[in-house]
Design a protein with these regions (language model features):
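Short regulatory helix/loop adjacent to the ATP-binding pocket of P-loop NTPases
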Residues: 267-285
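Recognition helix of helix-turn-helix/homeodomain-like DNA-binding domains
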Residues: 32-50
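Mid-core helix/loop region of P-loop NTP-binding domains shared across ATPases and GTPases
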Residues: 184-257
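Conserved small helical "lid"/interfacial subdomain of P-loop NTPases
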Residues: 286-314
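Short, basic-rich loop-to-helix N-cap that marks the start of a DNA-contacting helix
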Residues: 46-60
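Winged-helix-like regulatory helical subdomains adjacent to P-loop NTPase cores
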Residues: 300, 308-363
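Walker A/P-loop-proximal flanking segment of P-loop NTPase domains
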Residues: 81-148, 155-163
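A short, Lys/Arg-rich alpha-helix, primarily the initiator
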Residues: 1-33
Length: 363
């Protein structure tokens, strides 16, 4: 798949108008306010191809829906041409710092995948709560659900199933990071959700949001609410009335096309009770898997995916010390791989790994 995107020629006027609307007197001033360089900004504004992440960054800065602006080659669908991985260069084989970036790096959870996709195959779509301790892989599973069905088979491992849905390109997946303060208010969240279904507005109240969503939801849409704990424990305007409206939208005003999948450290009904919320929204999650350690067979498959093979004794040690928890597996595998790449670390990698394990387990 292409690793870069460009603005469609007929969308360039919209981009330049957005620059003016935002009050930037020049390209240089705009470039000073974003991460991408001035040369990248100039390419973007001319309709030349730039890196996927830079394209998304610039569109977000201008409050534009990147999916509306992107130039798509003829006879190729948007979903199948967009890159499924972050940044430039090869994917890091082990990365404990971030959720799994690409489906090929996701291991295990087959039971959860079967159940989740089974609930999303037919109308009405059903709601799911993914529960687990910190760093149990909740966000990775959430992102995997959105990516796996539209990732080309040649980019997956031979043992991975991807044909979970009958018509995967019909589905729209909307990821919401509720730890992002910009999405922790009605205004920010409304704009984010409406942009995802192709609507860009300046202001929106709850009634307008309900009207717009119920009118424009024409395809299966799954809203992924990651770390819902963050907003329920925060003093914000996402109150019971807001959550009740989301329940009403999914249950009565979306034609069965809308589902919510949330992640939390405890069941949403318990979380709501602990944080003073009484909305019936938190009772609509019939399937609520609790993520634990991986099955040992899946953990071994993960460890054996190293680009440099580990010795059997090292694999056994990693399995034992990690107890098959995905984050700890990733951490220890990273230590072992670095030692293979840098021989001076050979005598210390186990001790380094144990110290890191101790640090994270105490947090």
């Amino acid at each position: 798949m292409p690793r870069s995107l460009k603005v469609a020629p007929d969308q360039l006027p919209k981009v330049h108008l957005a620059i003016q609307r935002k009050g930037y007197p020049s390209q240089k001033q705009f470039a000073a306010d974003v991460v991408p360089s001035l040369s990248t900004v100039k390419k973007f504004l001319k309709g030349d191809a730039i890196d996927y992440e830079n394209f998304r960054e610039l569109c977000d800065k201008l409050d534009l829906d990147w999916q509306e602006l992107v130039c798509i080659p003829e006879n190729i669908s948007l979903v199948s041409t967009l890159p499924q991985f972050e940044g430039e260069g090869e994917l890091s084989p082990f990365n404990p710092s971030y959720p799994v970036a690409h489906p090929a790096g996701f291991f295990g959870r087959s039971r959860e995948l079967h159940r989740c996709f089974g609930l999303l195959k037919s109308r009405p779509l059903q709601n799911i709560a993914i529960i687990g301790a910190k760093k149990s892989g909740k966000t990775s599973l959430l992102k995997h659900l959105a990516q796996i069905t539209v990732t080309p088979p040649q980019q997956l491992r031979s043992d991975q199933k991807s044909d979970w849905l009958p018509n995967p390109t019909q589905y729209k997946w909307v990821f919401v990071d509720l730890q992002d303060p910009r999405l922790g208010s009605r205004d920010g969240l409304f704009k984010h959700l409406l942009r995802a279904i192709g609507l860009t507005i300046d202001t929106c109240d709850l009634e307008q949001f309900m009207d717009l969503m119920s009118t424009h939801l024409q395809q299966p849409t799954v809203i992924l609410l990651d770390e819902i704990d963050a907003v329920l424990k925060r003093d914000c305007d996402l109150d019971d009335l807001f959550w009740e409206s989301l329940r009403s939208l999914a249950s009565h005003h979306s034609g069965g096309h809308l589902a919510f999948i949330l992640t939390s450290r405890e069941h949403p009904t318990h979380l709501a009770a602990h944080t003073g919320h009484s909305s019936p929204f938190f009772n609509i999650f019939g399937y609520a898997p609790i993520l634990g350690a991986l099955a040992e067979s899946d953990a071994r498959t993960l460890v054996q995916s190293s680009p440099l093979p580990f010795a059997p004794d090292d694999i056994d040690w990693i399995i034992t010390q990690s107890e098959c928890w995905p984050f700890l597996l990733q951490l220890l595998c990273q230590c072992r791989l670095e030692a293979l790449q840098h021989p001076e670390l050979e005598e210390t990698w186990k001790q380094d790994g144990l110290e890191q394990l101790k640090f994270y387990l105490q947090k």
